[in-house]
From Swiss-Prot:
PROSITE patterns with a match to the protein in the record: GATASE_TYPE_1
Organism per entry: Pyrococcus abyssi (strain GE5 / Orsay)
Pathway(s) where this gene product acts: Purine metabolism; GMP biosynthesis; GMP from XMP (L-Gln route): step 1/1
Protein's UniProt keywords contain Lyase: no
GO MF annotations in UniProt: ATP binding; GMP synthase activity
Record has Nucleotide-binding as a keyword: yes
Quaternary data: Heterodimer composed of a glutamine amidotransferase subunit (A) and a GMP-binding subunit (B).
Name of the protein in its database record: GMP synthase [glutamine-hydrolyzing] subunit A
Domain of life: Archaea
GO CC terms in record: cytosol
HAMAP family: GMP_synthase_A (MF_01510)
This enzyme's EC code(s): 6.3.5.2
Domain annotation Glutamine amidotransferase type-1: ranges: 1-188
């Protein structure tokens, strides 16, 4: 089962719905859920949803602090992506412009999360802030003309972040991105 940490984003139920559609059990939980309760669920992966504020990400940061206790793939979406970057020493700030539209991204490195996908995708973005500086030990997987770090991955751990929303129907191959993440989690 993949646990979805609800950071108050408008699309969190779409993550659950997409995973269910592709045959993956998942559960949305409040981001304030105690770590012991999350561990008791024995998740195969964790998704940090989008949301309005880095100050309201509950126990997501504690999951990263205690990663060895979970040792499962993590995917941060939008705010979750920014949280991962900030936690590992990257910089987050206002983008050149607020993005609430389709944006074309270029996949620089296929990696597991983008396996089998075209090099260019149109994706749905809904954010004002973005990762401005990559954290140490991370690599950029995708970029766009307006956002240089659209997707990133830890170099040694299965921790990913995407600035865009793969769960939104407007995102090309969004379902495939979530399917690839589920495969990393051993769910497919």
């Amino acid at each position: 089962m993949i646990v979805i940490m609800d950071n108050g984003g408008q699309y969190v139920h779409r993550i659950w719905r997409t995973l269910r559609y592709i045959g993956v059990e998942s559960k949305i939980i409040p981001n304030t859920t105690p770590l012991e309760d999350i561990k008791a669920m024995n998740p195969s992966g964790i998704i940090f949803s989008g949301g309005p504020s880095l100050e309201n990400t509950g126990n997501c940061e504690k999951i990263l602090e205690n990663y060895d206790e979970f040792n499962v793939p993590i995917l941060g979406i939008c705010l979750g992506h920014q949280l991962i970057a900030k936690f590992f020493g990257g910089k987050v700030g206002r983008g050149e412009k607020a993005e609430y539209s389709l944006v074309e991204i270029e996949i620089l490195e296929e990696d597991e999360i983008f396996k089998g996908l075209p090099r260019k995708l149109r994706v749905w973005e809904s954010h004002m802030d973005e990762v401005k500086e990559l954290p140490p030990n991370f690599k950029v997987l995708a970029r766009s003309e307006t956002c240089p770090i659209e997707a990133m991955k830890h170099e040694e751990l299965p921790i990913y972040g995407v600035q865009f929303h793969p769960e939104v129907a407007h995102t090309e191959h969004g379902e495939d991105i979530l399917r690839n993440f589920a495969k990393l989690c051993g769910e497919l």
